[in-house]
Design a protein with these regions (language model features):
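Bacterial Sec-dependent N-terminal signal peptides
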Residues: 1-19
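N-terminal carbohydrate-binding accessory modules
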Residues: 18-105
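An active-site-proximal structural segment forming one wall of the substrate-binding cleft
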Residues: 22-23, 79-108, 116-118, 124-210, ...
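Long, low-complexity, intrinsically disordered polar/charged segments
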Residues: 71-85, 94-129, 265-279, 289-301
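Structural recognition of the beta-strand scaffold that forms the well-ordered cores
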Residues: 38-50, 106-112, 116, 154-156, ...
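Short aromatic-enriched loop/helix-cap "lid" or pocket-rim segments at secondary-structure transitions
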Residues: 52-56, 122, 165-170, 222-225, ...
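Extracellular glycoside hydrolase catalytic/binding regions
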Residues: 183-301
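Feature marks short, surface-exposed loop/turn motifs that line or immediately flank catalytic pockets
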Residues: 46-48, 114-118, 162-164, 217, ...
Length: 301
C-alpha cells in the first residue's frame, strides 16, 4: 500500500507543478487546462546585451564589445566589469516586473547574451569543451522568482548567439574579426549545448513560456538550409531533456523569412515574426498568416 500511495503522490505533484505550463493546441497557445493564453509581452532591451541603436551609441560604438572597449579605454578592465555588473543588477529589477503586472502584461521575453552562460570558443582552454558560467542562469532565476507571483510567463530569447547570427552587430554583438555562428561548427555546437543545458535547468518550471532559439538571424543562408539544420539540432538537444516547453522559431531576414523552415518538425512549436515601422492594419499580416492556416500552428509577433 505504501508504494501505491507514493506513486499517487508523485503523479499529483507533477501534475500540479505543471498546471500553468504552456503548449500549443492547433493555432492557439494554451495552458494545461486547455485555456487559450494570449501573450502580452515586454522585452527588457539592453539588459543582458547592449544594442547601440537603443543606447544611442551607434555613431561610435554600435555593438556591445565595442561599447565595452570604449569603457575599458576610459576606466580600465576592473571598473568596466564593475560597471557591467551594476548595469545588470539595476537595469531590470523586481520593481519593473511588478509594474508590468500592474499594466496588464503576462509575459517577459528575456534577451540573453550567450557569454553570460558560457565562454566564447576563443577562450575555451580545450577546443570543443564548454565552460559554464552561472551569471546568466542567476539572472533568469531572479526574473522567474519575480514573475511567478504575478502569473507572468518568461520566454528565453537567444539574442546574441555564439559568434553572432548576423552582420547587424548592434543586435547580436557580432565581431567581424571572429567566425560567426554560420562560419563555425564549434560555435553551432556550443549553441546546441547551451540550449540543452538551459532546457535541463528549467524543464520543470511552469512559468517558462518557451525557448526562442535564435533572435533575428540576418545572413545569406541559401534556402535557409543551415538555419533549419541548426534549429533542428537545438530541438533535438532540448527534447532530450525537456519534452514540455514550446519552441519558438524565427525566420531569417530579422525573423521574417521562413522559407525552408516549414513544415514544423516538432509538435509543440510556434513560428515567430517581427514587425517594425508599419501600420497596424490586419492586411499587413497577410504575408505571414498562411503559415498558421496551412500548418495549423500558432504565430507569435
Amino acid at each position: 500500500m505504501r508504494n501505491y500511495v507514493l506513486f499517487i503522490s508523485l503523479i499529483f505533484t507533477v501534475s500540479f507543478g505543471w498546471s500553468q505550463g504552456l503548449h500549443t493546441q492547433g493555432t492557439q497557445i494554451v495552458n494545461s487546462n486547455g485555456e487559450e493564453v494570449l501573450l502580452r509581452g515586454y522585452g527588457p532591451g539592453g539588459w543582458q546585451i547592449m544594442e547601440g541603436y537603443m543606447m544611442q551609441t551607434s555613431g561610435f560604438a554600435g555593438s556591445q564589445h565595442e561599447i565595452k572597449e570604449r569603457l575599458v579605454d576610459l576606466m580600465g578592465e576592473t571598473n568596466t566589469e564593475v560597471f557591467f555588473d551594476k548595469w545588470r543588477e539595476n537595469h531590470f529589477t523586481q520593481r519593473d516586473v511588478d509594474s508590468l503586472a500592474a499594466w496588464g502584461f503576462n509575459s517577459i521575453r528575456i534577451p540573453m547574451h550567450y557569454n553570460l552562460f558560457t565562454l566564447p570558443i576563443e577562450e575555451e582552454a580545450v577546443p570543443g569543451e564548454n565552460t559554464w558560467i552561472e551569471t546568466g542562469f542567476e539572472l533568469i532565476d531572479d526574473v522567474l522568482e519575480w514573475a511567478a507571483p504575478h502569473d507572468i510567463y518568461v520566454i528565453l530569447d537567444m539574442h546574441a548567439a555564439p559568434g553572432g547570427q548576423g552582420a547587424g552587430s548592434e543586435i547580436n554583438d557580432y565581431d567581424p574579426s571572429k567566425p560567426s555562428l554560420w562560419e563555425s561548427q564549434e560555435n553551432r555546437d556550443k549553441l546546441v549545448a547551451l540550449w540543452t543545458r538551459i532546457a535541463d535547468r528549467y524543464k520543470d518550471n511552469e512559468w517558462i513560456g518557451g525557448y526562442d532559439l535564435i533572435n533575428e538571424t540576418h545572413c545569406d543562408l541559401p534556402g535557409n538550409a543551415l538555419l533549419r539544420e541548426v534549429f533542428e539540432d537545438i530541438t533535438v538537444g532540448i527534447r532530450s531533456v525537456d519534452p514540455n516547453h514550446i519552441i519558438f522559431i524565427e525566420g531569417n531576414s530579422y525573423a521574417n523569412d521562413h522559407s525552408g523552415l516549414t513544415p514544423p518538425w516538432d509538435n509543440n512549436m510556434v513560428y515567430s515574426f517581427h514587425k517594425y515601422w508599419s501600420t497596424n492594419n490586419p492586411g499587413d499580416l497577410d504575408w505571414i498568416l498562411p503559415i498558421r492556416t496551412q500548418y495549423n500552428v500558432p504565430l507569435w509577433m
